[in-house]
Structures are given as C-alpha cells and as structure tokens.
Amino acid sequence: MTVSLSNLSNLSDLARKRVAVAAYYFVPGVVFASWASRIPDVKQMLHLSNGQLGTVLFAIPIGQLLMMAFSGILVSRFGSKKMLVLSELLYALVLFCIGSSTTVFHLILSLIAFGMMANLMNIATNTQACLVEKMYGRNIMSSFHGLWSLGGFSGGIIGAIFANTLLPIDVHFGTILALSILIVAVGFRFLINDAMAKAEEEDVPKFSFKTIDPILFLLGLMGFAGMFCEGTVYDWSSVYFSSVVKPDEAFIRAGYVAGMGAMTLGRFMADGFVTKYGPARVLKVCGGLILGGLWLAAALPYLIPAT
C-alpha cells in the first residue's frame, strides 16, 4: 500500500510539472497571437504602407538573432526555470509596450525586444519540456507545442473580439499582460529545478562541425522554408484579408484563427502520425498541404477558400 501511495504521489507531482510547463507554452501563444491579430490595427494606427509594415516586421527576427548567442548561455548560467519566468513576464510586458507605441521608432524598438524575449523563452521552455519528457520516458514534446498553438488559436479569437468591440489596443494588450502575470505566478513553483536535473546529467560530447551529417544542412533548409511559410501566415494573413479578401470586419482575422486552429490539431496529432506512418512520409504530405494551402489562398482570394 505504501508503494502504491508513493507511486501515486510521484505521478501526481509529474503531472503537475507537465501542466505547469504546458501553461508556460500556452501563455506565449496567446501573447504572440494578440500581437499578430492586431497587426492591421497597428498598421492603420501608425499609417504604415505595406512596404513600411514589412520593414517594421523585420524587427522581430532581428531581435531573435541578437539574442540567439546569449540565450543558451543565460539558461545554462542561471537555469531554465528562472529564465523562463523572467522571459515570459517580459514578453507580455513588451506586448503592452507594442500596444502603447505612438511612433514607428518606438514600435521597432518594442518588436526587437519582443523577438529577444521570444528567443530566450523558447530555449528555456524547450529545456523544461525536455526535462519533463525525460521523466515521462516517452515522446510528449508535440503536445507541448500543441499548447502553444492552442494559445495562438485562443489569442486570435480574443484579438478578434477586442478588435470587433473597438476597444483600444493598449487595453487589449494590458488585459493579456495581467492574465500572463497570473498564470506565470501560479505555475512557477511547479517548474523543474535545473540544479536537481543537472545533477543527473551525463557527460555530453563537445560540438564539432566535423561530426555533423551533411543531411542536417538540408533539414535546416527545409526547416527554414517551413518557418518562412509559417511567418507569412502569422504576419500577413490578417493584412491580406483586410486589403485583398475584404470580408466583413468580423471576419478579417478568420484566416489567422483558422491557421492557428489547424496548426493546433496538427501538433496534437503529430506524434501519432509520425509513429504510424514515419517522419519522411508525414513530412512530404505536410509540405504538399502547405504548398496547396498557400496557392489556394492566393489564387482564390475569397473568404471560404482563403480561410
């Protein structure tokens, strides 16, 4: 009986850790979608042309690139738990700064900081997820990424509601900031202590370009192409709907919300599909679906096919 209670206690503790990490994936999904769903409003507020908006949107990847060299160092030095909490809080705070931008310069600075916090948060969150997955002893990573997409889907719907009620962007983003602080504060104590995890780590071989299989560069190129398509949906779907598809105001964000909903389903089903059909076949089918979806949206710029 004692053993059974002990096992139950361990299982319950592990489940709490998984839920906490899942919540830390969900929050940035909501935060990012809040920004992405209001891009047309920010564009209109600052009187930006499509060309100017495209230039401004480069600020996020610039911030990610600037932080890339430091994120791993910070997580290793201070632990993923501390860096995750810090980056998620700052990520939501920067979102509020984006909504409060009154000049293009202010917006660009905010978006650079947004990208920097996103990169640090990605490293810290995935580190926590890897630790939980190791404890479970089976592949659960896609479910965490699915929670990010679910957050994006939810954030897109929330953004559409705020936009359709004509509430100011700073009120919308301020509400998301408050909710983010609440969730981060509740989940903090259930995150994994890195010091405890590091004590169990084995020696890891040092990185060397000589040991890299050339096929990894091809996979990296494929990943880049996938992220390029993904970024197009994130940054331009709402603008495309508002300027080309031109549906009723209530449906301007329909494309973004539909894309995030489909991504959520795909990520939750990914582990099962890969196990059943193999990664190569799934990759080919997904590539074809991406190509077909983008072509359909561009060739038939109407509400139903574009969505």
Residue ranges and their predicted role:
Residues L111-L147:
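Cytoplasmic helix-loop-helix junction between adjacent transmembrane helices
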Residues H106, S143-I192:
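Helix-loop-helix hairpin linking two adjacent transmembrane segments in secondary transporters
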Residues S37-G51, D235-F251:
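Short amphipathic helix-loop junctions that connect adjacent transmembrane helices
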Residues A33, I60-A69, G152-F153, M260-F268:
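Residue-level signature of mid-helix packing/kink "hotspots" within the transmembrane helices
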Residues K82-F96, R281-L296:
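Structural signature of the two symmetry-related core transmembrane helices
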Residues M67-S80, A163, G266-P279:
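Helix-to-loop junctions at the C-terminal end of transmembrane segments
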Residues H47, G79, S100-F105, K246, ...:
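Helix-breaking motifs and short loop linkers at transmembrane-helix boundaries and internal kinks
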Residues L66-F105:
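Conserved MFS/SLC helix-loop-helix module at the cytosolic interface between two early adjacent transmembrane helices
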